[in-house]
């Protein structure tokens, strides 16, 4: 598998990032291990999770990190994995939080659950819109210098706060984000393309879209109203089943048939 570098880092990754929010939610530990084994056997090495996955199950999260940690311990392959996790999301115990206090607490909890001494890529998962950019970046500076994190990245933050982050980092010699994880797929393109794509280019960021399959809609398994009642996620993605969504599915069918592939692969 040909690998590429995440921009402005020495992290080499295969060009598909596995999102681990299903671990401990729709996949139990055994099923998660099977998926991770197949992923690694395919030559892939980039795994993404978050400290709060899946908080909607138990109220606080942590299951995904624990499962990935157990898998790496069993496989003894931590050195082969580029590991990303996140901080800042809400749970039933607290709201969105990227304060220094929360980051310093959360990184240690993530390291313990993952059974590792460092995170390769640490994301601002959500912006709390209260904490100053300088406070957040100074927390990252501290944990990078402590060897707990190698590089930082951003996900659900506004274009304005992303710009401010680079300005503050430059002015105060603080760490800069090296990647952006935007919400982007074939049925939800506009926000990234109009608000973020130019910033990705300006700041030399790598981009790793989440929900690239629109939570499963673009796999093609949802073809009728009844299909949405058959899965845990069906209710939340039924919104895509409109004229636009159906047109995208039709286009995926044509392209996948032409190339003897699957809709999910094309998407």
Residue ranges and their predicted role:
Residues 21-23, 52, 86-90, 124-127, ...:
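Active-site beta-loop-alpha junctions enriched in small/polar residues
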Residues 7-24, 82-95, 118, 123:
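N-terminal small/glycine-rich loop or linker at the start of catalytic domains
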Residues 27-40, 98-114, 162-167:
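Short, acidic/polar
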Residues 1-79, 145:
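N-terminal binding-site loop/beta-alpha segment at the start of enzyme catalytic domains
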Residues 11-16, 43-45, 77-81, 115-120, ...:
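Short, well-ordered coil/turn segments that N-cap beta-strands
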Residues 6, 18, 32, 47, ...:
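Conserved, mostly hydrophobic/aromatic
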Residues 131-267:
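Beta/alpha (TIM)-barrel catalytic core signal, keyed to glycine-rich beta->alpha loops juxtaposed to Asp/Glu
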Residues 20-30, 90-104, 126-131:
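Active-site mouth loops of central-metabolism enzymes
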């Amino acid at each position: 598998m040909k690998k590429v570098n995440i921009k402005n880092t020495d992290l080499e990754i295969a060009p598909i990032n596995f999102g681990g929010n299903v671990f401990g939610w729709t996949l139990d530990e055994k099923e998660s291990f099977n998926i991770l084994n197949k992923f690694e056997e395919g030559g892939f090495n980039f795994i993404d999770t978050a400290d709060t996955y899946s908080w909607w199950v138990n109220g606080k999260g942590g299951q995904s990190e624990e499962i990935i940690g157990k898998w790496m311990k069993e496989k003894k392959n931590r050195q082969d994995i580029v590991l990303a996790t996140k901080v800042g999301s809400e749970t039933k115990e607290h709201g969105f939080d990227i304060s220094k206090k929360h980051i310093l607490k959360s990184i240690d909890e993530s390291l313990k659950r993952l059974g590792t001494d460092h995170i390769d890529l640490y994301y601002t998962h959500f912006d709390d819109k209260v904490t100053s950019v300088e406070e957040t970046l100074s927390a990252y500076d501290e944990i990078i210098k402590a060897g707990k994190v190698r590089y930082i990245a951003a996900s659900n933050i506004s274009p304005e706060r992303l710009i401010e982050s680079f300005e503050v980092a430059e002015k105060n010699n603080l760490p800069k984000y090296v990647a952006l994880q935007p919400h982007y797929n074939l049925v939800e393109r506009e926000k990234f393309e109009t608000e973020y794509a130019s910033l990705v280019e300006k700041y030399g960021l790598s981009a790793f879209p989440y929900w690239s399959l629109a939570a499963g809609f673009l796999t093609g398994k949802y073809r009728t109203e009844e299909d949405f009642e058959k899965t845990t996620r069906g209710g939340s993605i039924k919104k895509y089943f409109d004229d636009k969504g159906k047109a995208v599915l039709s286009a995926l069918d044509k392209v996948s048939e032409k190339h003897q592939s699957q809709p999910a692969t094309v998407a």
